């Protein structure tokens, strides 16, 4: 026969002094938390050590591309709405459920 024994208190299982000992000094030390595993960027002498990204984000080019994409998307949505409205005008003899199924199948 197998006999199980249980500890009478939780202190018999684990010593209380070791259960909740957590080293939390790292969480409160901002320098160690953010910069412990990386290099110190304040030691850089000049900007030649960093990549040159001038001209990468040209605002006028990004604005024109965004405007072009937005206008094409708006035109596509308008065409879709017009097609759906014309379809619903011709399919008035169908039930509402069938029109809903046709909408999602379209």
Curated annotation (Swiss-Prot):
Q: What does this protein do?
A: Plays a major role in programmed cell death (PCD or apoptosis) by negatively regulating ced-9. Binds to and directly inhibits the activity of ced-9, releasing the cell death activator ced-4 from a ced-9/ced-4 containing protein complex and allowing ced-4 to activate the cell-killing caspase ced-3. Required to activate programmed cell death in the sister cells of the serotonergic neurosecretory motor (NSM) neurons during embryogenesis. Required to activate programmed cell death in the sister cells of the M4 motor neuron and I1 pharyngeal neuron during embryogenesis.
Query: GO cellular component terms?
Result: cytosol; intracellular membrane-bounded organelle; mitochondrion; presynapse
Iron-sulfur found in the keyword field: no
Q: Which cysteines are joined by disulfide bonds?
A: none
Domain of life of the native organism? Eukaryota
Q: Name one GO biological process term.
A: apoptotic process
Q: What is this protein called?
A: Programmed cell death activator egl-1
Q: Which UniProt keywords apply?
A: Apoptosis, Synapse
Q: Name one Pfam family in it.
A: EGL-1
Database matches in InterPro entries = EGL-1 (IPR021543)
**Phenotypic consequence of gene deletion:** Mutants block programmed cell death. In an ain-1 mutant background, enhances the proportion of animals arrested at the larval stage, with egg-laying defects and with a ruptured vulva.
Chain segments carrying region BH3-like: 73-81
* Biological classification of the source: Eukaryota, Metazoa, Ecdysozoa, Nematoda, Chromadorea
What is its subcellular localisation? Synapse
User: Organism, per UniProt?
Assistant: Caenorhabditis elegans
Its quaternary organisation is:
Interacts with ced-9; the interaction results in ced-4 release from the ced-4/ced-9 complex. Interaction with ced-9 may enhance interaction of ced-9 with drp-1, but not with ced-4. A ced-9/egl-1 complex may recruit drp-1 to the mitochondrial surface.
């Amino acid at each position: 026969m197998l006999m199980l024994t249980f500890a009478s208190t939780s202190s018999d299982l684990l010593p209380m002094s070791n259960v909740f000992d957590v080293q939390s000094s790292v969480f409160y030390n901002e320098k160690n938390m953010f910069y412990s595993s990386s290099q110190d960027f304040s030691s850089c002498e000049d900007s030649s050590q960093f990549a040159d990204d001038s001209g990468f984000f040209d605002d006028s080019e990004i604005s024109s591309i965004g405007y072009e994409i937005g206008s094409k998307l708006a035109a596509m949505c308008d065409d879709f709405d017009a097609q759906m409205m014309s379809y619903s005008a011709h399919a008035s003899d169908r039930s509402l459920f069938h029109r809903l199924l046709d909408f999602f199948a379209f």
